[in-house]
Each structure stands twice: as structure tokens, then as C-alpha cells.
UniProtKB/Swiss-Prot annotation:
The gene is del. This is Protein deadlock. GO terms for biological process: fusome organization; germarium-derived egg chamber formation; mitotic spindle organization; oocyte development; oocyte karyosome formation; oocyte localization involved in germarium-derived egg chamber formation; oogenesis; piRNA processing. Residues 1-60 are annotated as: Required for interaction with rhi/rhino. Developmental protein involved in oogenesis. Required for germline maintenance, stability of mitotic spindles, localization of patterning determinants, oocyte growth and fusome biogenesis in males and females. Also required for dorso-ventral and antero-posterior patterning of oocyte and eggshell. May be involved in microtubule function during oogenesis. Part of a rhi-dependent transcription machinery that enables the generation of piRNA precursors from heterochromatin while maintaining the suppression of transposon-encoded promoters and enhancers. Residues 72-195, 274-307, 327-352, 375-446, 554-586, 642-662 are annotated as: Disordered. It comes from the Eukaryota. Residues 377-390 have a biased composition (Basic residues).
Length: 981
């Protein structure tokens, strides 16, 4: 038998997926699906076979799980016939195989079998139109499953056989079940009341209703009045014929098969079948060894019809000898109606499944009793001893040889005792065990019925027949035949546990002599090879040629510590010598400890000078030479650089030394750190050499360090917010305050501070927020050169640089670097072409320029007004006029700027008052006639008519104007900060 557990889990799950797809996951609850899945996995561990036979004369294998046969796959009645609503399974009465739809309460019931209404033959599950053998006696299945005709009795006559040979052309009505009146049916009365027969009761055609008879069973098959039924009785079965053309309003109830209250006991014979691999199904199988003397013939009555009368009579005589009748007279009373429980297939219940099924025996033969007797005796003797030892092998996980070996260890319970216990459990679960039945049954009958109950509950779905081989174990073979070991018990061959043999083996190994671990001291070993008076002498001897004094490297006064005694293995521990019992253990331990210390702590003593003189001449010369070598002065080792220096490196060093020797030594000036002079000297240097340009100083620092400094110093929690790229709503964009940032900047060194500033100018937001903090720190540390660099950096962000430019210029003006600052502004920040775009920056530049040396850049101011149409504000002109009143050259340049827009100047009272005061002071110095002709240039233009003056140009609106110039976040974030031109 193949082991199903070898099938991969993926294949099992694919089958389960097909089941779920077919039924639908919503058809059952989750708890029911879990129960079904456990039973589904358990079903793969059960042995099974597939009976492909459709021949009703061949019984099903009762010791294996058989796939149910489908009925009426093809319609034998023509196109006008209709199939039954539920499947019908054809099965002989003497077969105890499981049925298609069993349940816990239906284990005793049998299925109805259909017969052809035309000829009275038993109709197979598949139409005989396509069958190869028209007669069941010639079927190949009849040749394969040959078994003795156990249920054929001597009551049947040759006339009855001839009637069956004529196919029972005349229809016979079924007599009453318990009270037959027909004389021709009297011979069949034992079979009519047998418990294994299908008993049907039909209503008459004209009778509208039919009440239950007192002798009838509670579960009967009742057909509708319109249905036609013909009853055909055989030697082995009582079949029912249904006309499927009739109306479907039929009521089918199953009859309990093993009801024992109103039926007589049927005589059965032991059937034994042998399963072999389905390689050649046409080869007949040999019977079991304990049934070799019995006749092994065909099991079909139809096959008996094909025999000659002479052979048939001989067969009938042989069957009479082997047939055992057990008659039982019982009262004909209706059995209690069975309760039908809703549940799944019994094959899914693990408790009702057996690893092996014995043969179904209604009456044990003498051979079965002889086999069971030694089993009962052995069980009673060794039940208590074998119970903790015997373990049942896992179900469905062993092959046939392993299964037989494992069954040898399970001899603690006999066959009939185990069957009776499980039958009791099944009957209690179904609720059909009553006191009345128990009182009316004998132990043998209970056992036989239990076997039938168990066999009827082992139905399970099987798999393909070509993939697995059938079971080789003989059916009905008791456990004693399979478990035989060559160990005589009471002069007989009985079953012996393997564990018992293992126990004897272990006892034998324990009784074997083991080598004793003798612990011997080294002293004892020495005493064996030495005499009693001989001992090791470690003292000095003049005759010794060699001495171990040279191995001493310590000092003379050195105290040598005693070595701790070495821990030896447990087997090598020193055992005390046997001494009289009067002595105590303490002196023995002390003596042994002193002995161990005296031996292990021994060292060869160093020789003194006196002892050295007494040494032999050879040893004396050796010692003297060693002392001379120690007193010699060791030569100084060569420098390691010269010793280990490679040749190429030494040649290169020599060339460098020769080159340096040929050149004269030159002195190089020592330069101080750049841009770290005092403020006073710096102001003097700038004023003396105004053309000097201070370069920008950049320090190389890694970007990663700068990013880390930015996070720590400024307290930035979201780097995406620095570049205005954060899209999160709940992100934290808060930073440290200006005071906290300035405290951190003050504690930094100069290089770190400058590096952090270079990282800051890369961000528009950080530049706008912390620019003034860096200006204050550089001013506090007198780093004026870095302030000039910061002044130039205002060109990077022109839209926000107007207040920043004023702040840094104010810091530079305090140290006297105004001209240098104006020069940097006019070189890098002055952009007349973008004056209208960055009006704030241009106005701030004009304010700085009007308060500084504006006369040096008068041409640029004139160009700004004429070429770029940017009018200089009046407040800047007023500042320029006030600063040039005392100087005639500057005043002349100021008048040039004023005359650019004479109409707007005339409306300004401040400018007109300054000009009038200037003209009065100039006329006071000269005569009035000369003052009119030699007045300041441009004075005559003020008297010109307004029409002669060119109208002023319209101003372009300022798109980059900031209404609230602050150092915090503003709307100027969207301006392209990289557009510097």
C-alpha cells in the first residue's frame, strides 16, 4: 500500500483549493471549515483502494476504504426516463463495505439497489450497453475476486436455480416480512428476517396511505402510488426495482441493517480476501494460508448458473459441510426508530477510524477461536507490563513491512476486545444503545455487530487507483499470525516484545566486567623499578660530568615561590595507602601533602663559588668562559635607519645632500598671518594705499561638517525648510533665537566661524536671518577684513540686501574704513542697469555715497540720471549741497547734479534756500557787477522759463520693493536668488 503522506503539501493544498472553489467559502462557517480541513489532512494518512468494478455480484472490499460507485451514469431506459434525485449505489447484501451517505445514526442502514424492470436482472451502476461482459459470471471482476459462496444455504433447490437461469421472467410480489403466507416463500423465511437483508415494504397501487405494520421495521422504503415496483429475490440479495419514469414524489427511508429485535440471525461464513497490486487484474488470487482447505469459488449466483448440474451439485454439497447455522428465535417487534444526526462523513472523525480492520465475522470458526485464545492469555499476563511500553505507530505513515513490524509491539489487547470497546463507543455516540438490546444479545452477537458498525463508518474519498498499490496484508488474519518471534514461551511460539529483548541486552551489557580505573601514584611506579633503599639523590656529587647550574637565571638571594600542586584528573587522583583502621585520616593527608610539596617544589640549587672550585676542570672552564663573555663590552649597534634603509632611498638622500651643499643658504622672510593687523594700523594702511584690494579668504572645510554645525548652532530641525522645499504640514520649522546663536558663535574659533559663515550664505533664509549676527561677531573680534567680504556678499541677494548693506557699512565706518567700503560698494554692488528693479538697494547706496566721498563718483551719478533715467532723490541732493558749500570745487559738481532737473528743484524750498544763501555769500565777497557775470555756473538756468526745461521722465515701478525689510522669513523667498546680474 502506498503511503499518502509522501504526497507533497502543495498537492494537498491544491486539492483543498479545488474543494473550496467548488463548494464556496460562504457555505460553511469558519469553525466548520477548520474541522473539515483537519479531517481532510487526516484522510491522506489512511489506506485505501479504488474498486472500479461496476459488477453488483462482486462485493466491496470491507477491510479498505473504497470510493463509492456512481449509479446510473448512463440512462438504460431510453431518452424518456428520468434519473433519481439522489445517487443509487448497487451493492450485494453480504457486503459490509461503507455506504455513500453514512452518518453517526445511519451506520446500520443500507442503500436501495435498483433492478431492471424488464428482465429482472440486477442493474449495474454503469449501463451494460457498453459493458464487455453481458453476464456477470463471465465478468473479469468475478475472476479476480473469487470467494466462496458463504451465504448460499442448502435450502435452495435446483428449481430455484433454473428459475434464476430464466431471469425470473414472472414478477413475484414480496411476502410479509415477519409473517409470510406463501408456501413457496417459506424456504426463504430465515433470509427474510436476517439482519443483513434489505427489507422494503411497498404500498399497494390503490391504497392512498399505508400504516406501519407491527412486525415491520420502523425505517421502510415507501414508494408513491404511481410508481411501479417489482421485487426480485436472490440467494444473496433482495433488490428493489424502481421505475424512474414515475413521478419523483417518492419517499425513501433506509432500513437499519443491523437491527436485532425482529430479525433472525443470519449465518455467515468467514470471507478472506487478498489484495495485490493491480498490475494484472485477471490473475486469480490465492486464499489465505488458514483457509487453504476450504473451497474458493466464485461469489456470484449468476456465475453458479453457468455451471453444469453435476458440478453445481458437488459445490452445493461442499458448501453444506462448511456452512454453520445459528438459528435464533426472537420476538417480532418494531425496533426503536433511529435518530438521524446532522454531521459530516464519519471518515472525518478520527476516533472512529482504525489503523486496520479485521474481517467481519458473524460467527467465529474454530480456527478463529484457537487464534484468539493465546492472544487473550498473553494480554491478561502482560497487560500491565506492556501498557507503558507499547506505542502505536503514527497512522498512515508506514509501509506494509514497517506496519507489520509495528504491529508486533501492540499485543496488549485482543481483536475482539478492541472491537467491542470501539463498538461501544460508536453505539453510545449514536444514541442507539438501549437496555433492551443489551439484555437480548449475547457477547458473540455484540462483537459481530460491532464489527459491522465499525466497517460501515470508514467511508472516505479515495484517490486514483493507478497511483497506489493495494494492501498486501491478508484480510481476517489475526494479530498473532503477524507477530511471531522465535522466543519460546511455555513451549509455544508466542508474541514477544522487542523492548523485552532490549532489556535483556541492556542487562547483559551492565553485567559485563568493566576495566577498573586504578589510580596509582608515581611513587608506586618508581618503587616497582627501584629497591627499598634506593631513592633519588638531588645533592651535589663531584663525579657528575654535567650540571644543571647553568639553567639558573635568577639571583642568589631570590626566594623561589613554591609551585601550587597541579590539579590532576579524577581518575588520576592519589589514593592513600591502606593503613590500619586505628589511624585517623588527618595524619594521612598531612603526610601526603608534605610529600607532594617536597617533590614538586624541588629545584636544582645554584652552585656557589666554593662549590665551583670543587667542580671538575672541564666544568670549571665552561663557567669561567661564560663570566668572561658577560664582562666584555658590547659593540654599539649600527643605527636602524642605516641598516634597514633601502638602496634607492639612500641614493636619493645622497643626491639631495649634494645638491644642498652646492647651493648657498638663503634666508626667507617670516610672514605674519594675513589680515590680522590692529584696527589703527589697518585704517592707516587703507588710507595710504587706497588702491589695495583685500582678497577674500576661503577656508576648506567639508560640507558635511558645515551641515552638522548649522544644525547644532542654528537649531534647525528640518533642512528642507531652509531651502523652502518642505511639503509637510506638521513639520517643525522653529530655530534658535538670535541671542542663542550669538552665544554659540562667540565660543567658536576664527576658522570655524568663517567656515560656518560660508555655509550660511548658501541659504537665502539663513543669510537674511543671521547676517547681522555675523557682522556683530566680526566687529566684536575686530575682523574688519571679513566685514569687507560680507559687504561684497550683499550682491548675492539684492532684493533683501538694502538693510544688510547699511548695517555692515555702519560697522566699517566706525573703524575709519568709509572710503574702502564705498569703493567695494561702487565696484561690486553698484548696478545702475538694475536700479529700477532693486530700487531699495540703489537708494541705500545713494545714501551711503552722499555721506561719503561722492565727488569721486560724480560722473556715475550723472550717468545714472541721464542714461538710466533714475532721478537722484532730493534728500541726497540736499546732503550733497550742504557738504559742498564751503568748497567751491565740490559746490560746482553739486550744481551740475541739481541742474539735471531744474523744475523739481524750484519746487523744493530747502534746495532753493541753500542756493540763495550760497549766492549771497558769494556776492558779499565780490562786487555786485562782477557777481552777476561771474556767478556760479548754472545759476542763470533757475531764471529760465519753465517751458524751456525738458519735462521729467516717468519712473519705472519697483517690482522688488520690500515694504517691511526684516531679517526673518518674508515673501521674497520666491525671488530667484541666483540672478545676480
Amino acid at each position: 500500500m502506498e503511503k499518502l503522506d509522501k504526497i507533497r503539501m502543495s498537492q494537498k493544498l491544491s486539492c483543498w483549493q479545488h474543494i473550496l472553489t467548488t463548494l464556496g467559502t460562504s457555505s460553511k462557517t469558519e469553525q466548520e471549515w477548520n474541522t473539515f480541513f483537519k479531517g481532510f489532512l487526516e484522510s491522506w494518512r489512511k489506506p485505501y483502494c479504488i474498486q472500479t468494478s461496476c459488477d453488483p455480484s462482486i462485493p466491496l472490499r470491507k477491510e479498505l476504504l473504497v470510493r463509492p460507485r456512481k449509479a446510473l451514469q448512463e440512462n438504460p431506459h431510453g431518452p424518456g426516463s428520468t434519473l433519481p434525485e439522489s445517487p443509487v449505489f448497487l451493492e450485494p447484501i453480504n457486503s459490509t463495505a461503507p455506504r455513500e451517505h453514512p452518518s453517526p445514526s445511519k451506520s446500520h442502514s443500507t442503500g436501495s439497489t435498483g433492478c431492471d424492470p424488464g428482465n429482472g436482472e440486477r442493474s449495474p451502476s454503469v449501463s451494460n450497453k457498453n459493458s464487455k461482459y453481458k453476464n456477470p459470471g463471465n465478468s473479469k471482476y468475478a475472476k479476480i475476486w473469487k470467494r466462496s459462496n458463504n451465504h448460499t444455504t442448502s435450502i435452495f433447490s435446483k428449481a430455484q436455480i433454473s428459475k434464476r437461469r430464466d431471469k425470473l421472467s414472472s414478477t413475484k410480489k414480496r411476502p410479509d416480512t415477519c409473517a409470510p403466507t406463501d408456501d413457496s416463500r417459506k424456504n426463504r423465511e430465515p433470509r427474510a428476517c436476517a439482519p443483513n437483508k434489505n427489507i422494503f415494504k411497498t404500498r399497494e397501487t390503490n391504497a392512498p396511505n399505508l400504516t406501519k405494520n407491527s412486525c415491520a421495521l420502523p425505517n421502510v422504503l415507501i414508494l408513491s402510488p404511481n410508481s411501479a415496483s417489482k421485487i426480485t429475490q436472490r440467494g444473496h440479495s433482495v433488490g428493489q426495482t424502481q421505475d424512474y419514469k414515475a413521478s419523483p414524489g417518492k419517499i425513501i427511508k433506509r432500513v437499519p441493517r443491523y437491527s436485532l429485535q425482529c430479525l433472525k440471525k443470519k449465518t455467515e461464513k468467514v470471507h478472506n480476501k487478498i489484495m495485490d497490486k493491480p498490475k494484472n487484474k485477471q490473475q486469480p488470487q490465492t486464499p489465505p494460508p488458514f483457509l487453504l482447505n476450504n473451497e474458493y469459488t466464485e461469489s456470484s449466483d449468476d456465475s453458479d448458473d453457468q455451471l453444469p448440474l453435476s458440478e453445481l451439485s458437488q459445490k452445493m454439497k461442499s458448501n453444506k459441510l462448511n456452512t454453520l447455522f445459528l438459528s435464533r428465535n426472537e420476538d417480532c417487534s418494531p425496533a426503536p426508530e433511529k435518530v438521524k444526526l446532522k454531521g459530516e462523513r464519519p471518515a472525518q472523525n478520527k476516533k472512529e477510524q482504525l489503523t486496520w480492520e479485521p474481517s467481519i465475522l458473524t460467527n467465529l470458526t474454530d480456527l478463529g477461536k484457537q487464534v484468539a485464545e493465546p492472544l487473550r492469555k498473553s494480554v491478561k499476563k502482560s497487560a500491565k507490563q506492556q501498557k507503558p511500553r507499547v506505542r502505536a505507530p503514527p497512522q498512515g505513515k508506514k509501509t506494509l513491512p514497517q506496519l507489520q513490524t509495528g504491529l508486533k509491539t501492540q499485543d496488549k489487547q485482543s481483536t475482539h476486545e478492541m472491537i467491542s470497546e470501539q463498538a461501544k463507543t460508536i453505539s453510545e455516540a449514536s444514541g442507539q444503545q438501549t437496555s433492551q438490546v443489551q439484555s437480548s444479545l449475547s457477547p458473540n452477537n455484540i462483537r459481530n455487530n460491532s464489527v459491522k458498525l465499525i466497517s460501515a463508518k470508514t467511508l472516505m474519498p479515495a484517490q486514483r487507483s493507478q497511483d497506489y498499490s493495494p494492501n498486501k496484508m491478508q484480510v481476517g488474519q489475526p494479530l498473532g499470525f503477524a507477530i511471531e518471534l522465535p522466543s519460546p514461551v511455555d513451549g509455544k511460539e508466542a508474541s514477544v516484545e522487542i523492548d523485552t529483548q532490549l532489556v535483556h541486552t541492556s542487562k547483559f551489557l551492565e553485567n559485563m566486567t568493566r576495566p577498573s580505573t586504578v589510580e596509582v601514584h608515581k611513587f608506586d611506579l618508581m618503587d616497582i623499578f627501584m629497591g627499598e633503599n634506593e631513592k633519588l639523590d638531588y645533592e651535589y656529587d663531584d663525579d657528575d660530568v654535567l650540571s644543571v647550574a647553568a639553567s639558573w637565571n635568577g639571583l642568589d638571594d631570590e626566594n623561589v615561590p613554591e609551585d601550587e600542586p597541579r590539579k590532576e584528573a579524577k581518575t588520576a587522583e592519589q589514593l592513600p595507602k591502606p593503613e590500619p583502621s586505628t589511624e585517623t585520616l588527618k595524619p594521612i593527608e598531612k603526610e601526603n601533602a608534605q610529600k607532594m610539596q617536597s617533590i614538586k617544589s624541588f629545584q636544582i640549587p645554584k652552585l656557589n663559588a666554593k662549590n665551583l672550585k670543587t667542580q671538575p676542570s672541564v666544568m670549571r672552564s665552561i663557567y669561567e668562559n661564560e663570566e668572561l663573555e658577560k664582562n666584555k663590552v658590547l659593540a654599539k649597534p649600527a643605527p636602524p635607519s642605516l641598516v634597514h634603509q633601502p638602496l634607492a632611498e639612500s641614493n636619493r638622500n645622497q643626491r639631495d645632500e649634494a645638491t644642498a651643499a652646492r647651493r648657498a643658504k638663503e634666508t626667507f622672510p617670516v610672514f605674519a598671518p594675513l589680515y590680522r593687523v590692529a584696527p589703527e594700523s589697518a585704517a592707516t594702511l587703507v588710507s595710504a594705499n587706497s588702491q589695495q584690494v583685500i582678497p577674500q579668504v576661503y577656508f576648506s572645510t567639508s560640507n558635511q561638517d558645515g551641515v552638522n554645525w548649522i544644525k547644532d548652532v542654528f537649531g534647525i530641525r528640518c533642512m528642507q525648510s531652509v531651502d523652502n522645499k518642505c511639503i509637510s504640514i506638521n513639520c517643525d520649522h522653529t530655530m534658535n533665537s538670535l541671542g542663542e546663536v550669538q552665544k554659540r558663535l562667540m565660543r567658536m574659533d576664527e576658522d570655524t566661524l568663517l567656515s560656518l559663515y560660508r555655509q550660511t550664505i548658501r541659504s537665502f533664509f539663513l543669510f537674511q536671518t543671521y547676517y547681522t549676527s555675523f557682522v556683530d561677531i566680526f566687529k566684536f573680534r575686530n575682523l574688519w577684513q571679513y566685514l569687507l567680504i560680507m559687504l561684497v556678499d550683499c550682491r548675492l541677494y539684492k532684493s533683501i540686501s538694502a538693510p544688510l548693506l547699511a548695517h555692515v557699512y555702519e560697522a566699517l565706518s566706525k573703524c575709519g574704513m568709509q572710503k574702502e567700503a564705498v569703493k567695494r560698494i561702487m565696484e561690486h554692488v553698484w548696478l545702475p542697469c538694475k536700479a529700477h528693479k532693486y530700487r531699495d538697494l540703489m537708494l541705500t547706496t545713494l545714501n551711503i555715497l552722499s555721506n561719503a566721498n561722492w565727488e569721486d563718483y560724480c560722473d556715475k551719478l550723472t550717468q545714472l540720471d541721464k542714461d538710466y533715467n533714475f532721478e537722484i532723490p532730493h534728500k541726497n541732493l540736499i546732503t550733497i549741497l550742504k557738504s559742498s558749500v564751503d568748497c567751491s570745487d565740490k559746490f560746482a559738481n553739486a550744481l551740475k547734479l541739481i541742474t539735471l532737473h531744474p523744475n523739481s528743484i524750484r519746487t523744493n524750498e530747502t534746495i532753493m534756500s541753500i542756493l540763495s544763501n550760497a549766492s549771497k555769500s558769494y556776492s558779499y565777497m565780490h562786487n555786485e557787477s562782477a557777481s552777476a557775470s561771474q556767478g556760479p555756473p548754472g545759476a542763470a538756468s533757475f531764471l529760465a522759463p519753465p517751458a524751456a526745461i525738458q519735462p521729467p521722465h516717468t519712473t519705472v515701478p519697483n517690482f522688488g520693493y520690500l515694504p517691511n525689510p526684516s531679517f526673518h522669513y518674508s515673501n521674497e523667498y520666491a525671488i530667484n536668488i541666483h540672478n545676480f546680474d
